[in-house]
Amino acid sequence: MNTQTIDATIQRFNAIRWHDSKLVGLCFYRAEGEERVKISLEMLGEGGALTPAEMIFEASTYVALDVDLEGKRVCSDDISSAECYASSEWTKSLSEKSPYDSFEGYLHFRLYLIPPGGTINVLAKDFSLEMGAPG
């Protein structure tokens, strides 16, 4: 993945309107020879309408979850924000623990739930967002 593609992916992810959208599901699966992480969402649109959506993290290699399910429920499954990074403390930590694994071309996708909901971290090469998908 070249720098231009990485930058475009980061910008595309960070441009999504995350605040007060809802995290309603999480799934791990394998397709086309790669690991994938799917999150089912209800994306908040103009006028407060919620639209079902699915986000697929493609070519995923690591996931770290710190989710308080009761806190998530109490806060109506709301997402606070989300960000994508080319490099982060988490990716540096993974590299130190696994010096023989190459994480070149991987991006750190992080979703923050409304406190005390927690965080979801995914190390993947790309993502796709399908609006109107069943949740």
Where are these regions (language model features)?
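Surface-exposed, interaction-prone regions used to assemble/regulate multi-protein complexes
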Residues: 1-135
